[in-house]
Amino acid sequence: MVRILSQTKWATINPLKSSQPLGGALAFLGVGGAIPLFHGSQGCTSFALVLLVRHFKEAIPLQTTAMDDVAIVLGGAGHLEQAILNLKIRAKPKLIGICTTALVETRGEDLAGDLASIKLERAEELTGTDVVLANTPDFDGAMEEGWAKAVTAMIKAITRIGEQERQSRTIAILPGWNLTIADIEQLRDIVESFGLKPIILPDLSGSLDGIVPDDRWVPTTYGGISVEEIRELGTAAQCIAIGEHMRGPAEEMKTLTGVPYVLFQSLTGLNAVDRFVSLLSSISGRPAPAKVRRRRAQLQDALLDGHFHSAGKKIAIAAEPDQLYQLATFFICLGAEIVAAVTTKGASKILHKVPVEIIQVGDLGDLESLATHADLLVTHSHGQHASARLGTPLMRVGFPVFDQLGSQHKLTILYHGTRDLIFEVSNIFQSHSLAPTHRGT
């Protein structure tokens, strides 16, 4: 049985987690013509914006209600209304996704009531723009929770309620926050190879994939799932959720539309992908295409090649719960040993399935103290300081990755993604073991 140890320190040393509103904003960025709006101070928005820009290396349309000291005392409804109207006039978005911050949540404002009043009084001016509220206070949860809350909020506010005529070849996919742009593109490719039509919420592969739209500046996201597609999610024959944190959105969709769902806690590793391919084959009535079978064979060969480099290695991982499970099970399949596991929150049910004895809720300072005998650190770019002090190589995963290019175009799921992860890990071990030692002059 896994023991989950709570954080007992009075201060965070080298933070591991990113905030809930940042996760919520990232989910809203997966909708075409959207603008995420932080309801809080300018500083909250600026910090999140810097992290997003450094990670994606793209312009991010993130806005703020710019709460000041007067609004904190008198209430922020006026700032919220003005921000929504300004965005409608200047950017004409299809969706404004509001993410609350600790500032307004701590004050205890009736945010849902404020927004309902604004929508009622300004209905004519807001025609053509959906406004969605996700309660994402910084003081609770992390990116994982913020992403899930934003997806749930979009389903509740936009998706048409009630059972509808099902499209037998349409599948709704709810990807977890830890899937990269390349992962989502690969998901779409494999689903379409079975003759099925995927509707992916959120779809970052259409909005943050690194293209310049028609050589012009766009004030909103320039791609992603459309608001109309979100509205018609109830026509899907099946919903597939990826990651335990996406169970809530999938349950909400089932409650509102009756669409059944299947949850995959990870799509990394041979067995998990085999189950996914089997489900697609069952839904479509078709066998796995030749190119999918070939990718599976490539993964089998990679497992044989990579296990010589990874077997017996000691791995230290710091990540949010679902990504921790994804990576830990991946390394165990390679014959490695997880000697340190650190995560952001201890409430997720997936933590009890992570193949370790102890999980520490904490920060990268905890990872560093637990990883003194590790052969590899696995976390985001802020782990570089621990890596340098310990002299242990770092495999960069998750968010943010700001000291390498192309992190969002790295595959981590399905047959190809698992294969590529094996190669990456094996190459890290090889290059580190062959690194030149210091020679005195």
Curated annotation (Swiss-Prot):
Keywords: Metal-binding, Nitrogen fixation, Plasmid. The keyword RNA-binding does not apply. Pathway: Cofactor biosynthesis; Fe-Mo cofactor biosynthesis. One of its GO terms (molecular function) is metal ion binding. It holds the Pfam family Oxidored_nitro. [7Fe-Mo-9S-C-homocitryl] cluster binds at C44. CDD domains: Nitrogenase_NifN_1. It comes from the Bacteria. One of its GO terms (biological process) is nitrogen fixation. The keyword Metal-binding applies. PANTHER family: LIGHT-INDEPENDENT PROTOCHLOROPHYLLIDE REDUCTASE SUBUNIT B. NCBIfam families: nifN. This protein may play a role in the biosynthesis of the prosthetic group of nitrogenase (FeMo cofactor). Belongs to the NifD/NifK/NifE/NifN family. This is Nitrogenase iron-molybdenum cofactor biosynthesis protein NifN. It comes from Rhizobium meliloti (strain 1021) (Ensifer meliloti).
